[in-house]
């Protein structure tokens, strides 16, 4: 009888999970600053993505800038919808099936317990998507998975977070004093 080895756990992803658990559990000390490096964030994304999007989403990668981020992944939108239990009509299914490289560029602004994520640019299979087509994709694919998501509009940060800074080196989460 062969023994099954437990799947390897990435300690960098575990580090992010521990930090988020402290913040979300209300155990963060007033004035604390939590640093999540770019390497940790990418490790966490690789572990977390299959839990959040079980089908049709592979090879996530995040490149951070000064209050910006580029996200990359291979996405099969039809499989993503199927995995979320969303029905797709035949015509739309034929248009969206198949895995495509996707790049999303966003700008991040945060202060006084609030934040806004501004979607700057989306590329699907090398084609830039914008305007009403981008709005359609957000309504059809993103919002059904995350109905409470806010894009291009401010939202309250949770768990006593004052603000979040994004730099090429990583993300700093500041807890209110």
Positions of the model-derived regions?
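Extracellular/lumenal and peripheral-membrane lipid-interaction modules
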Residues: 3-177
